[in-house]
Amino acid sequence: MAPPPDTSGSCSAFHECERIFAQWGYPFQDYSESFRQSLDTVCRCSRFFLGVVKRDAHVIPLLASLFEGQTPERNPSADLQQRVAEVADRNGLMRVLRQWRNREMAIIAWQDICGLLDIDSVLTRISETAESAIRTALDWLFDDACRRWGVPRRKDGSAQSLVVLGMGKLGGYELNFSSDIDLVFAYVEDGELPGRNGATYAEFYTRLAQSLVHVLDAVTEDGFVFRVDVRLRPFGESGPLVVSFDSCERYYQAQARDWERYAMVKVRAVGGDAKDGREFERFFHPFVYRRYLDYRVFGELRSLKARIMAELRRKDRGDNIKLGAGGIREIEFIGQAFQLIRGGRNVELQDRRILVVLERLGRLRLLEHGTASFLCAAYRFLRKVENRLQQYEDKQTHELPVSEERRGLLAFSMGFESWEGFLHRLDEVRRRVHEIFTEVIAEPPQPARGEPLLDGGEAELSQALAGFDGAAEAMTGALVKFRASAPVRRLGAGARAELQRVIGKLLAELAAFRVSDPVGVLGRILELFESIAGRGVYFSLLAENPSALSQLVRLAAASPWIVRLIAGAPILLDELLDPRTLYSPLTRESLGREADILFSSLAPDDDEQLMLRLRQFKAAHQLRIAAADIMNVIPVMVVSDYLTDLAEVVIERVLRLAWKFAAARHGIPPVEAETSVDFPGFGIIAYGKLGGIELGYGSDLDLVFLYDGVASDAVTDGPRPISAAEFYARVVQRMVSLLTADMPGGALYEVDLRLRPSGSSGLLVSKADAYENYQLHQAWTWERQALVRARFVAGDPKVGARFDAIRRNVLCRERDSRQVRLDVRSMREKMREHLADRRPGVFDLKQGVGGIADIEFIVQFGVLISAAKHCEITRWTDTVRLLDSLRAINFLELGQADRLRCAYCDYRGRVHRLALQEMPALAASSEFPGHRTAVEAVWKQIIEAPVF
């Protein structure tokens, strides 16, 4: 770094360096020109540094060694501990701490100003310096206090130290150069010290904390160690200096204010017993990171920011680079807003370091990638400016200098040739930061409809709804009924105000969207609001995000099923925030990765939370699929693909839980061949719509369970051994229980196990050999029809391969086509008689003549009588690809296959849409005449052909 132009008061820095060298007896010319230049530069930019090298003879040779790379890896903390071990009293402790601190901070200032450390490393080094000082001082003071007053002990007899919690920038390894440190003091167990007049532990730890604050904070002839702020403790300045774990728990559960969550985002134990410190950190976690999405954070941050700005204006300190517009605090608020809203559900955001959080916000697309990158760069720039301001005199300032000399030095130290160039860059950064802050945190514009719709009379409501013409009266009635409902009447003032905002915006959206049935859509959404009224945070979400409310109106207009889905899992409202993800269902691999991330934040033994989270996961992705379906983003066949992928991911996760549950009690059965798979010897076979990759929105799961590769007399290897068959049966029982349990959000899936060998009277899990024997020698034709659509979906791949071989062997057998035709026709007639809706004017899309079941039976018949000569057609399990396969072997003519495929896809599409409308799979008898005629013709030609 070239020296700055000589300015008054700084031109003598070089000569001052020469005098200092001479003072300590170091030959000035023996050091390299570049090293001497670095000292000159830093002495110009930091009076603090100049003062330290004047007082401490050891600094210059240490810096020279560092500069030339001749010093082995330093351990400042160990150096401090060694020095403190030699002190005899508190005055000696204070002197050693200050001298050590000044030396370390001078080294950091030199490395920072000369560009030898990046700003991230500088902030970390300062934080580590503070933590070393805290830990070392506390250890000395604790030992001293124990000698004086006795040792506080736990119930198990071990010594119990004070726990020191670092808040704010100290906790996040982000301390600036002349920062104060925010500390909270706590201890785990209450008690009394030994002795006739023994003090309580509270008194002991209070004295200890007071001593620590004094040792660190007091200003002596050697300066201070770190300024200490203890106002973030429970009850603030009016509360005790030290709190017990129980008191702390009661406070944060019942009395803590919302703004205290922000202070706790970075909390970290920085002194005392490490195990106790981790316990305190874990305690704060649920207070900071809520399990639900708390959009009230935006309003709270706006209020806090407004108070800060008002205070700055009052003190005429608007040019503050930390608290002013576009300053450091606004960047921190942006990151913390997302942490506090989403951190409870997204473990990646549970990080103390703001730069890590911002980077992850970009990666998770919660912020635009470019925006996140800019904020990281802006944060580093502003923190560098902050350090330069404070390094000058070791003062805690955030104000830009006024004098020409100081301005020139600041610009130079930041790498700019002029103050004007630096200020231009600073203003650019702050302007863009403030723009982003406003976009993220600022209150959204209010709609024109601002009437007190929850409190006014019917006349005001009618006036507000005048633009809806004939629907106004019915909508007025719906709103009157809604606001009189018990959940709405019980709302607190804050939630009621948020709901007031939402209702006004809702009516504006209904008018702007020109909903064809505003009464019905309003009614659905009001029912949803009534069901979520106990969680006012969801009203905050909709009030803060007009686009989410807009998406809700569109989806509610298209599907009451979606509204009911959201009512069962209100967390889904968060999915409406970003149309890019709302209308973009995930692939099988992406679903698996998201599930892994989602569950990684939960305790592995917390099955209840795992299952609740799994229900939310399933519902969120069902919503994405339905939204993309409604908006015609994906075709009908892909809808079923996505629903099938989702079900498979859920099944795999439930299998993991069930397996873990059984294995913890009984161990696992030994398999005959060595394997490293997760579920040795066990496989899940999907039948029906899941097996055929044709799942619908309300489909249940037809499942069959197999085991293989396990000796018939094998037992598990755990503390309570059971037979292999019994172990696998318990896994299945647990799986079914988890899948069908009625929890908030409903069951995951309904499960049907009747397609297993011997149906409801058969074993829950079949040995593969027995399953094969049953399929070959005992199964009915309809069971072999079902096998056409069966496939392996989870478990041991070896069991999957065994099942594939069994299925191929069974399906590719020679059959009497005459008997198969009779069986298929008979079964279909029974189904029509018992399942079809035969009312006049109605066409049953699934069971009616010429409907879906007829197409599926034609395909299954074709496979059963053709696979012996064309075994390759058994490769597929879904109807559409089987139609193509049957066309390829000339079982179907080209026109027949095309007409059946077209009819099948159109029918399935209508069934999906009806499910979203919560309507049965029925159409008017006048609909689909061409499809019905075509299917009937093929049915008659193939299934009802004369049997001789």
Swiss-Prot record:
GO biological process, one term: regulation of glutamine family amino acid metabolic process
GO molecular function: [glutamate-ammonia-ligase] adenylyltransferase activity; [glutamine synthetase]-adenylyl-L-tyrosine phosphorylase activity; ATP binding; magnesium ion binding
Catalytic activity: [glutamine synthetase]-O(4)-(5'-adenylyl)-L-tyrosine + phosphate = [glutamine synthetase]-L-tyrosine + ADP; [glutamine synthetase]-L-tyrosine + ATP = [glutamine synthetase]-O(4)-(5'-adenylyl)-L-tyrosine + diphosphate
Segments for region (Adenylyl removase): 1-445
Cofactor(s) annotated in UniProt: Mg(2+)
SUPFAM superfamilies: Nucleotidyltransferase, Nucleotidyltransferase substrate binding subunit/domain
EC number of this enzyme: 2.7.7.89, 2.7.7.42
Record's signal peptide: none
Gene3D superfamilies xref list: 1.20.120.1510, Beta Polymerase, domain 2, Glutamine synthase adenylyltransferase GlnE, Nucleotidyltransferases domain 2
Location of region: Adenylyl transferase: 451-948
Keywords: ATP-binding, Magnesium, Multifunctional enzyme, Nucleotide-binding, Nucleotidyltransferase, Transferase
Function: Involved in the regulation of glutamine synthetase GlnA, a key enzyme in the process to assimilate ammonia. When cellular nitrogen levels are high, the C-terminal adenylyl transferase (AT) inactivates GlnA by covalent transfer of an adenylyl group from ATP to specific tyrosine residue of GlnA, thus reducing its activity. Conversely, when nitrogen levels are low, the N-terminal adenylyl removase (AR) activates GlnA by removing the adenylyl group by phosphorolysis, increasing its activity.
Official protein name in the record: Bifunctional glutamine synthetase adenylyltransferase/adenylyl-removing enzyme
Organism: Methylococcus capsulatus (strain ATCC 33009 / NCIMB 11132 / Bath)
